[in-house]
Regions:
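Buried hydrophobic core positions in alpha-solenoid tandem helical repeats
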Residues: 1, 40-41, 82, 86, ...
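An alpha-helical repeat/solenoid feature that recognizes helix-turn-helix modules
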Residues: 4-29, 48-75, 79, 92-132, ...
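Asp-box/WD-like beta-propeller blade repeats and closely related beta-sheet repeat scaffolds
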Residues: 36-53
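Conserved loop-to-helix junction within protein kinase catalytic domains, corresponding to the end
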Residues: 180-182
Length: 184
């Protein structure tokens, strides 16, 4: 591990650092001579990003797409592999959960996956169909007050994740309403 303190069990640490370096105007492919994109995503030193659940796969895809990074043909974890892993782990009825064996969706994870997959919808009909199901279940999850919950706790973080997901799909979040109350 070239970065003291970065976990080799949680690839999202690498992905968050990638985003932070990029946001600060740096180059994640050369941080002190180390390549966070290669080591944290497509040749992931922490192992298969999907081993950290949907969070790992989604954030690996977000890191790769954050600046349109090229992925070598011989890479272990390509965009295609990450997308296929995500699509295979959709819960019945649409959406995703952090846990690969869960049978019900988690709003936060579903929203993260939506904005990770959004750039790939136009090039892959399976991605678009999966996103359509996810958007439907997110619309179904809105409370009477227009909020979203993580578990049974309505909170601004879950609502913010859904807002990001909706806008990544070109949907104005103020147009998504609860069917019974009409609130958004």
């Amino acid at each position: 591990n070239p970065f003291t303190g970065l976990s080799t069990n949680t690839p999202t640490e690498w992905h968050r650092l990638t985003m932070a370096v990029l946001a600060a105007g740096g180059d994640p492919t050369n941080v002190g001579g180390h390549d966070l994109i290669a080591d944290g995503t497509y040749n992931c030193l922490a192992g298969d990003p999907s081993n950290q659940g949907m969070n790992g796969a989604a954030w690996a895809l977000l890191a790769l797409d954050s600046n349109g990074y090229e992925v070598p043909a011989e890479a272990e974890y390509t965009r295609e592999k990450l997308i296929n892993d995500i699509l295979k782990k959709e819960v019945p009825g649409g959406g995703w959960s952090m846990n690969d064996t869960a049978r019900t969706l988690e709003v936060d994870i579903t929203a993260m996956v939506v904005y990770a997959l959004a750039p790939h919808a136009s090039e892959n009909p399976d991605v678009q169909a999966t996103l359509d199901r996810a958007l439907k279940v997110l619309r179904d999850e809105i409370s009477e007050d227009g909020d979203y919950a993580s578990g049974s706790d309505y909170n601004c973080e879950s609502t913010a994740q859904v807002i990001i997901a909706l806008t990544s799909m070109g949907i104005d979040p103020t147009t998504v309403t609860n069917a019974s109350s009409g609130k958004n």
